[in-house]
Swiss-Prot record:
Species annotation: Nostoc sp. (strain PCC 7120 / SAG 25.82 / UTEX 2576)
The keyword Transcription regulation appears for this protein: yes
InterPro entries: cNMP-bd_dom (IPR000595), cNMP-bd_dom_sf (IPR018490), Env_Response_Regulators (IPR050397), HTH_CRP (IPR012318), RmlC-like_jellyroll (IPR014710), Tscrpt_reg_HTH_Crp-type_CS (IPR018335), Tscrpt_reg_NtcA (IPR022299), WH-like_DNA-bd_sf (IPR036388)
GO MF: DNA binding; DNA-binding transcription factor activity
Role according to the record: Required for full expression of proteins subject to ammonium repression. Transcriptional activator of genes subject to nitrogen control.
Keyword terms of this UniProt record: Activator, DNA-binding, Transcription, Transcription regulation
Record protein name field: Global nitrogen regulator
SUPFAM superfamilies: cAMP-binding domain-like, Winged helix' DNA-binding domain
Coiled coil: none
Entries under Pfam families matching the protein: cNMP_binding (PF00027), HTH_Crp_2 (PF13545)
GO CC term (a single one): cytosol
Residues of the HTH crp-type domain: 143-216
Length: 223
């Protein structure tokens, strides 16, 4: 199985269909759990559509978002990195309705051994996720919720943004509740803060999609 730069990882997953346990397509509605911390790490996932939230759950019940995964992301790969069988470390939840491919971890491990180029593709994706996790940690370090919200919007611009005439549109339908859960706030607070940004012409919202006008100006003023 030769991996070329223009071949999506999704196609690589599908080419594993000749194995005894072929990849399967799964769908999850928003807020549905894909796996819990402590679940056996038996499969690797490839995100076809939508966005997935990875979070850590602590003993006090607090849940901290560490990453938002976009289409063409691979996740559930900790056992591949450590070389040891392990349980899930994160709570993976559908941030939007999602469609994904999953394959047994043994098959993915074999594919990585046979295809160094595939390993590089996955490594690039993991590097991007590490950067996003660092940015999320910085976001949650803000005590001021206004700064926290703006930092989160800028992360979404980076990872889900589509350039448009008015700025950058975040290509996700975001409810106020979903944003609140991601930044550790409340829906009421998020609604108020988004309203303030709209009044200042910093953002606009159409059909739950947020457009950020002049992201650089926004970052300088609020973060």
């Amino acid at each position: 199985m030769i991996v070329t730069q223009d071949k999506a990882l999704a196609n690589v997953f599908r080419q594993m269909a000749t194995g005894a346990f072929p990849p399967v397509v799964e769908t999850f509605e928003r807020n549905k759990t894909i796996f819990f911390p402590g679940d056996p790490a038996e499969r690797v996932y490839f995100l076809l559509k939508g966005a997935v939230k990875l979070s850590r759950v602590y003993e006090a019940g607090e849940e901290i978002t560490v990453a938002l995964l976009r289409e063409n992301s691979v996740f559930g790969v900790l056992s591949l990195l450590t070389g040891n069988k392990s349980d899930r470390f994160y709570h993976a939840v559908a941030f939007t309705p999602v469609e994904l491919l999953s394959a047994p971890i043994e098959q993915v491990e074999q594919a990585l051994k046979e295809n160094p180029e595939l390993s590089m593709l996955m490594l690039r994706g993991l590097s991007s996720r590490i950067l996003q996790t660092e940015m999320m940690i910085e976001t949650l370090a803000h005590r001021d919720m206004g700064s926290r919200l703006v930092s989160f919007l800028l992360i979404l611009c980076r990872d889900f943004g589509v350039p448009c005439a008015d700025g950058i549109t975040i290509d996700l339908k975001l409810s106020h509740q979903a944003i609140a859960e991601a930044i550790g706030s409340t829906r009421v607070t998020v609604t108020r803060l988004l309203g303030d940004l709209r009044e200042k012409k910093m953002i606009s919202i159409h059909k739950k999609k947020i457009t950020v006008h002049k992201p650089v100006t926004l970052s300088r003023q609020f973060t």
